[in-house]
């Protein structure tokens, strides 16, 4: 039994070694027992437990004596209760709540529940399902284990035979009896691990011997085994032509070899001069005389390699300092420089979410982590609740509070666990043996390991270190060999390059010689070929001439045939022409009839158009005539009022002047008229007497009557003259009022007036008739009377001349005034005519300009617009998105050599009309705005390229007219067609908000249509105007608050977005 006890003790210690952590591994440098023990003590003393830390399996880590354990404080003893099961037996006091299996204190009474087990008589079986502990060794069920003979294998296949565990029972089992022996082909044979078992394994028994062709023979690595291997046995001796002869490497064996006997001497131009290798011979060579100095930009400056010369170089002067962002700062590697770096200064602290917090690794940091601080408490649903692991939490869990009672069919019945219920169950009836013996041995050797185990561990570690050192030495040796081989290869390459260069030179010279020879041969061959070609050409020429003759004869025959064919063709052509003529005549008749019908239709259409045009022209002419008449009436009324005012002024002035002149003339004429009247009265009395005497009417009466008539005519003439004089005076007064006091009289008129004066003087002389005296007897009296009469006549003549001179002056004045008045009236009339003509011209030019504007705005070609319409229509209906490139390609049709129709309003009108007709009913606002955003680029492109002033007004007026023609339809119960189109025009940025407001305010010819549309646009118009008011109110509020809190306003202005107004519109739109 003693031997068995020792073996068990050894196995337990080995298991403790495997459970050891990496922190308490033994150092390889310390070999003695004292050093290991002291170090372990020092580690344990200095190690401080952190908060909520529980140390497990501590009794095999410590090497203290039992005396030292007893001297510790109460706190440490309480901690050790949890740590070691040995101390638990001594110091732990059982409480009433704790159930201990196998307890024999029957005197202590416990409060039993219904489900609790009565441990007073635990051995007796109470239920059928309970285990009968009285005889636990006996197997009760087929599935129970038979503990009476646990060592014996009960099942052939599944059970392990513990009676002889070391022996292998199955093919797959490990044979622990002699684990060193190899049982399978794939297993290693530990009995003699050096022996090779497989082809691929290394034979460690004699690793020096070569087993495969590819293996190195380490037994005599110097001997060459393959053709390609180096023979290290006598590496100095040259075996192949290509090998170096190391026996006397200094002696030159080949021409190409380096002569190492005097390697310092330079033999070739290209060779290095080793006599003074430090001196630089070529530009490309390194100058070894001062290799530390930097000679090129790309070279390293070895004089001070620590200093950084380039941006990319490492600064060796202080390699610890960080030079780049990506470099580690070795000066203080513990400090974290980047976000992604670990902070080594305090690696225990958690820096990222994904990192472990080593400061308190027991605490749970993530949802998926276990909370080691209180591992007993349940953190997740799936975790076990260790705080009260005895209580059953789920249906599938074991109820440890009453673990003895079997709850399910598949559960073990611990109430009588000693009894074997099934064949597969263990028999615990004799399970208590071999427990005390092990515990005693463990108590004696708890604190310390045996010496041979420690030495074994040290020996193993030394072995490992030696093997590692050997491996490193081998690797270093191999590296040196590889470096030598690479150096040699480089030298061979350089030599090979030099040989190749020399060979190339020789080949070039040979090629030159060969070229010269080839040239001479080619020249001779060319001469021979030329002669041969000449002879062949002559023969071919002869043959060609003969062929030409034959061809000429054939051509003649062909010409004759062609003539015949031509005659036949002419006849056929005549027949065809006649047929064609008849067909053409019939077609012409049909075409004429069709043309006549078309012409009639066109004429009808033209007549209708002409009628419409005539009606339009008549209306325009009537309107113009009305306007002209109204203007003429206004002008006439103005002239009449002016004339009245002037007449009244002139009448007053003329009356006063005439009165004064008449007074003067009357006073002068009184004397003359009195003398004449006396003579006439005498004559009349005399005549009356004669008439009374004679009853018949004599010739004198007739003459008198004639004279009276003449007088009446003269009086009428005088009256006319007076009237004319008055008119002349009026004209003079008008001229004075107009500022024309000086009148211009032509010279011809003056001469004419002088001649008239002379004629009047002559007439006066002839008119003086001599009066005959009836009484011939009284001649003397008559002579005296004649003398008196002559004197009187002279005086009369003088008076008459004076009168006539006055009248002439008045006449001249009146004639001149008439001429001036006529010129003034003509000038006034001309001015008025010119003014009227100018006004008419202005109206006509205005109308022409309006017509030109209208034509420019609506200029179009029908075919081009049709093509444009056909291309756009399907895309707009399919809700196609127009890019900038699509707009350019589609609108390229509108540009022609004659005219650019993009400048007009027609293409825009076509697009918007198609869009209006393509809008479906009963859609949401978002869908309409998506459609508008698809067509937005095309509308903006057409508007930008148009050259129309106030284009926005034309767009709105035309959309309004189009909606009026459609009779203002509704797309849904809430929205109408006009509202959606106005929204699209505003949302797409084609028409600005201010232009909408101005359009509503303007009074145009479309005022009636606007008033109709306002029935549907009332709320839309309110929305526009209210926004402006809101903005103005906001601005006023800001102005008021600026005076109070300037800082608050500045913060608000920063936070307000640039497109604040547009965002507000957007919210109301959507």
Curated annotation (Swiss-Prot):
GO terms for cellular component: cytoplasm; membrane. Residues 66-88, 355-388, 423-483, 667-692, 735-786 are annotated as: Disordered. Residues 735-745 have a biased composition (Polar residues). Keywords: Coiled coil, Merozoite. CDD domains: W2. Residues 475-736 form a coiled coil. The keyword Acetylation does not apply. Residues 435-460, 474-483, 751-765 have a biased composition (Basic and acidic residues). It comes from the Eukaryota. Possible candidate for an effective malaria vaccine as determined by epitope response in sera. Residues 73-83, 773-786 have a biased composition (Low complexity). This is Uncharacterized protein PF3D7_1120000. It comes from Plasmodium falciparum (isolate 3D7).
């Amino acid at each position: 039994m003693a031997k068995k006890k020792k073996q068990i003790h050894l196995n337990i210690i080995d298991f403790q070694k495997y459970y050891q952590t990496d922190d308490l591994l033994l150092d390889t440098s310390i070999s003695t027992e004292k050093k290991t023990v002291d170090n372990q003590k020092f580690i344990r003393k200095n190690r401080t437990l952190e908060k909520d830390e529980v140390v497990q399996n501590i009794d095999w880590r410590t090497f203290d004596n039992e005396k030292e354990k007893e001297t510790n404080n109460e706190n440490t003893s309480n901690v050790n209760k949890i740590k070691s099961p040995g101390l638990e037996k001594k110091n732990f006091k059982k409480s009433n709540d704790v159930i201990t299996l196998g307890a024999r204190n029957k005197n202590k009474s416990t409060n039993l529940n219904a489900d609790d087990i009565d441990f007073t008589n635990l051995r007796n079986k109470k239920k059928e399902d309970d285990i009968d502990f009285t005889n636990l060794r006996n197997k009760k069920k087929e599935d129970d284990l038979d503990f009476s003979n646990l060592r014996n294998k009960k099942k052939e296949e599944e059970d392990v035979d513990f009676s002889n565990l070391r022996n292998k029972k199955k093919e797959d089992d490990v044979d622990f009896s002699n684990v060193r022996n190899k049982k399978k082909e794939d297993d290693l044979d530990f009995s003699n691990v050096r022996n090779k078992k497989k082809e691929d394994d290394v034979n460690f028994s004699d690793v020096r011997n070569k087993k495969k062709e590819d293996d190195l023979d380490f037994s005599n690595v110097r001997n060459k085994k393959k053709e390609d291997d180096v023979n290290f046995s006598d590496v100095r001796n040259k075996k192949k032509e290509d090998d170096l002869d190391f026996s006397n490497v200094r002696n030159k064996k080949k021409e190409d070899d380096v002569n190492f006997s005097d390697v310092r001497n330079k033999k070739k131009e290209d060779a290095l001069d080793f006599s003074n290798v430090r001196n630089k011979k070529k530009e490309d060579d390194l100058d070894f005389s001062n290799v530390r100095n930097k000679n090129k930009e790309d070279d390293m400056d070895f004089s001070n390699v620590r200093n950084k010369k380039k941006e990319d170089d490492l600064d060796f002067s202080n390699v610890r300092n960080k030079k780049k962002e990506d470099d580690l700062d070795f000066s203080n590697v513990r400090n974290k420089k980047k976000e992604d770096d670990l902070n080594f200064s305090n690696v225990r602290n958690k820096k990222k979410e994904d990192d472990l917090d080593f400061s308190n690794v027991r605490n749970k940091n993530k949802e998926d982590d276990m909370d080691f601080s209180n591992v007993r408490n349940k953190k997740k649903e799936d975790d076990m609740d260790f705080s009260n692991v005895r209580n059953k939490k789920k249906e599938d869990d074991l109820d440890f509070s009453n673990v003895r009672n079997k709850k399910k069919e598949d559960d073990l019945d611990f109430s009588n666990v000693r009894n074997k219920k099934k064949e597969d169950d263990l028999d615990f009836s004799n399970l208590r043996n071999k427990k005390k013996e092990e515990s005693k041995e463990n108590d004696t050797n708890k604190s310390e390991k045996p010496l041979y185990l420690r030495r074994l561990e040290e020996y193993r570690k030394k072995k490992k270190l030696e093997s590692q050192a050997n491996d490193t030495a081998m690797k270093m040796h191999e590296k040196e060999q590889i470096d030598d081989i690479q150096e040699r290869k480089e030298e061979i390459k350089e030599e090979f390059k030099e040989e190749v260069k020399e060979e190339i030179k020789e080949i070039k010279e040979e090629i030159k010689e060969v070229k010269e020879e080839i040239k001479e041969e080619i020249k001779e061959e060319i001469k021979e070929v030329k002669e041969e070609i000449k002879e062949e050409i002559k023969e071919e020429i002869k043959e060609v001439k003969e062929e030409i003759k034959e061809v000429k004869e054939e051509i003649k025959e062909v010409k004759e045939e062609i003539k015949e064919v031509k005659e036949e063709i002419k006849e056929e052509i005549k027949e065809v022409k006649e047929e064609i003529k008849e067909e053409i005549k019939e077609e012409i008749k049909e075409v004429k009839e069709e043309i006549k019908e078309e012409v009639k239709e066109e004429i009808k259409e033209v007549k209708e158009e002409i009628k419409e045009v005539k009606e339009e022209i008549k209306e325009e002419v009537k309107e113009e005539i009305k306007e002209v008449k109204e203007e003429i009436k206004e002008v006439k009324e103005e002239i009449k009022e002016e004339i009245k005012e002037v007449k009244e002024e002139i009448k007053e002035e003329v009356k006063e002047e005439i009165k004064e002149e008449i007074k003067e003339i009357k006073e002068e004429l009184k004397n003359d008229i009195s003398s004449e009247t006396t003579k006439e009265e005498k004559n009349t009395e005399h005549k009356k007497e004669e008439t009374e005497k004679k009853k018949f009417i004599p010739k004198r009466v007739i003459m008198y009557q004639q004279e009276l008539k003449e007088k009446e005519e003269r009086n009428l003439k005088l009256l006319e003259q007076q009237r004319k004089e008055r008119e002349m005076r009026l004209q003079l007064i008008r001229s004075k009022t107009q500022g024309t006091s000086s009148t211009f009289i032509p010279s011809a008129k003056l001469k004419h007036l002088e001649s008239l004066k002379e004629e009047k003087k002559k007439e006066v002389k002839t008119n003086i008739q001599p009066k005959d005296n009836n009484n011939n007897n009284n001649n003397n009296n008559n002579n005296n009377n004649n003398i008196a009469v002559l004197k009187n006549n002279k005086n009369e003549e003088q008076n008459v001349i004076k009168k006539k001179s006055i009248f002439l002056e008045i006449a001249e004045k009146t004639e001149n005034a008439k001429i001036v008045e006529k010129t003034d009236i003509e000038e006034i009339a001309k001015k008025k005519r010119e003014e009227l003509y100018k006004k008419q011209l202005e109206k006509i030019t205005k109308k022409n300009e309006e017509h030109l504007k209208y034509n420019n705005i609506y200029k179009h070609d029908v075919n081009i617009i049709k093509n444009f319409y056909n291309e756009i229509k399907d895309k707009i209906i399919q809700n196609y998105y127009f890019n900038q490139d699509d707009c350019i390609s589609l609108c390229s049709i509108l540009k022609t050599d004659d005219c650019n129709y993009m400048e007009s309003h027609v293409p825009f009108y076509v697009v918007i009309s198609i869009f209006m007709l393509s809008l479906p009913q009963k859609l949401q606002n978002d869908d309409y705005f998506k459609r508008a955003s698809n067509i937005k680029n095309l509308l903006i492109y057409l508007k930008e390229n148009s050259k129309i002033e106030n284009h926005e007004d034309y767009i709105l007026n035309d959309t309004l007219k189009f909606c009026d023609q459609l009779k203002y339809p509704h797309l849904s119960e809430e929205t109408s067609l006009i509202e959606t189109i106005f929204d699209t025009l505003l949302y797409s940025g084609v028409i600005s908000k201010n232009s909408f407001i101005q359009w509503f305010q303007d009074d145009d010819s479309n005022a009636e249509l606007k008033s109709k549309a306002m029935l549907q646009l009332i709320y839309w118009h309110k929305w526009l105007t209210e926004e402006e008011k809101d903005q103005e109110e906001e601005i006023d509020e800001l102005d008021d608050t600026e005076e109070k809190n300037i800082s608050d306003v500045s913060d608000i202005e920063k936070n307000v977005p640039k497109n604040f107004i547009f965002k507000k519109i957007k919210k109301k739109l959507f």
